[in-house]
Amino acid sequence: MTIIDCHVHLNHYEGTKYLPLEERTELLLRTMREGNVDHSIVLSSYKVNPDRPSTEQLIEVTKKHDNLSIVAGFSIDGHNDNDFQNCRRWLQDGLIKGMKLYCGYEHYYPYDERYQRVYDLCIEFGVPVMIHTGDTYTSKGKLRFAHPLNIDEVAVDNPELKIIICHLGNPWIQDCEEVIYKNKNAYADISGLVLGEFTHYFEDFMADKVKEFLNYAGEPRYLLYGSDWPLSNMDSYLNFAAKLELAQHSRELLMFRNAQALFKI
């Protein structure tokens, strides 16, 4: 079966061995080959520094690899008008597949009016916006900005906008269920539910949560497979997804068809 991982990073994270960006890219490609992952979508960050490459750097380092696509991170504090115009140009040229907001990491609600130009741009080019929800990797994140219920306002006010709620809003998965059920323009990825590898107990626990999600919101036409590599182990995540009790058609929707349609891959 085709596999699209819609949520990976090429950042260097504290506590891991530092590798130059080119070597990180090769590590991602090797990990994909080992897991039979056909395509990955690389997300740039809400800030640029030696550990977090810019969208432009990611475009450059992945341009030789047809199995890697880019989603551009955008922030209120870390990006300016010139950065925004670059995103427009990259969308026009087909170099990025969508936009990503990091609510919680930066302390603004997703319905802050300063994000509206990002939503308008995504609507104009027919691409999704991905929005961080739930727990943050850093303790400096502020969780009230990352609650999935905040996405409801964006979905209602922008009915033509395709929104991907990252991480199922974990730990507020039940609230994310309602946002998805209510808003037909809202989707969610299952990435980043664990740091590192799943333990047997936690794997069963999260599988039950995903099952409950599906039972509440219906057919998984709105769920996308993603890992959050390298924060989450790709092989462990693939094993987790394989154990989800899904009919073949539903599994295909989760593992590649939904992402294929949303990101036009």
Regions inferred by a protein language model and the residue ranges of each:
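Histidine-centered divalent metal-coordination motifs
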Residues: 7-13, 132, 167
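Catalytic pocket-lining loop regions of alpha/beta-barrel enzymes
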Residues: 94-98, 111-224
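Active-site neighborhood of phospho(di)ester-bond hydrolases with catalytic His/Asp-centered motifs
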Residues: 3-6, 41-44, 71-73, 100, ...
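Conserved, mostly hydrophobic/aromatic
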Residues: 7, 32, 58, 99, ...
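Mid-to-C-terminal alpha-helical segments outside catalytic/metal-binding sites
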Residues: 1-10, 19-39, 218-222, 232-265
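Active-site gating/metal-coordination segments in enzymes
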Residues: 38-39, 49-145
